[in-house]
Amino acid sequence: MSKFIMVGCDLHDKTMLLKVASDRDSAEKISVQNTRAGRTRMIADLQAKAKAAGGASILFAYEASGQGFGLHDELTAAGIECHVLAPTKISRSTQQQRVKTDEKDAEQLLQLLRAHVLAGNPLPTVWVPDAQTRDDREVVRCRLDAAEKLTALKAQVKGLLKRNHLARPESLGKGWTKAYWGWLRGLSRDSAHGVGLRTSLASLLRQLDYLDDELERLDQALLELSQSARYAVAVMRLVQLSGVGVLTALVFLTELGQLSRFANRRQISAYLGVVPKCYESGSANDRKGHITRQGPSRVRRVLCQAAWARVRREGTDQLAYERIVTKNPKHKKIATVAVMRRLAVRMWHIAREATSEPSGPQPGRLSSSLAGACASPPRPLG
């Protein structure tokens, strides 16, 4: 029987606590500094243990967190089999939740590894995206975050006006038009109002100007990303769907990554959290709750906005929405989720077929298509 060195790691910003064991032997507790030098020393020590055990294989497990996948990359590069586990799929008893320590967490991960090696139990692992996908996610998420900040600043401006009993003139219409911007700038310079109001409003307007410029830069970066060989064909196909823009397509592609890991529409729907919770026990076998909201929330947000755009246009999704709402007018949210699920499955089918095609993109045709998709005014999540 092959020998294994199994390591359960509780990872933190500055330290790592390891529980190291060989097969069924008792575990050894090791504390490591979470620095480059500390991790290099840890890898060397584990390799020395494996060599002393007659060339044993090393298995390493830690929970996914805000630390990212840097540790996974270092271990994999050193030839160590690393598993990144999903914290939400690791069952913990009530007693374990009451008494939580780093050592107990590392011990639990070690036991999961042991059960995997010795009994063949599956590990609740997460999919580890490649370095390029992670890098692409950063710019897409930055664009989403900037849009959220812009929306929050506009809400602050409205709140400031409301607190000071300043009503928007009806002649300015609705929305953040040039006329409305001009009126706000005039208020920020009007000496008839207090210094505090003018200073606060001027500060908020400067921040809005800055974020508007940033959104333009980020939109250009997204346009360039969408025209890259990795996403060109898929984005061109996806933006042809009603309600789906370049940003929505890129959020979908970068957050989901390898689309072939989903075998069918049920798996993609469950991963995105647009399926209902289930409460079945005994004769009560048809109790459904709210959606699970598992998976990337960013994808659900853009799907929701795209779904509302599709509902406003004639088509099968509008008919599906109206069919549910007609039965019960209170089920508008349920109908929206149904449209979101239909759209997600359709996007998955299209993107999977596009990414599996051997032929490369056609930059000339693609550029004009995407430029048209991005020509509309910036939307928070469009």
State each model region's role.
Residues D13-R41:
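Short glycine-rich, Thr/Ser-proximal phosphate-binding strand/loop in the N-terminal lobe
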Residues H83-T125, N285-Q294:
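Short alpha-helix plus adjacent loop in nuclease-associated cores
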Residues A234-K332:
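Phosphate-backbone recognition surface of nucleic-acid-processing proteins
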Residues R39-L59:
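Short, basic/hydrophobic alpha-helical segments
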Residues S283-R287, Y321-G382:
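Low-complexity, acidic/Ser/Thr- and charged residue-rich accessory regions of DNA metabolism proteins
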Residues S2-A21, L109:
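Gly/Thr-rich phosphate-binding beta-strand-loop-beta motif of the actin/hexokinase/Hsp70
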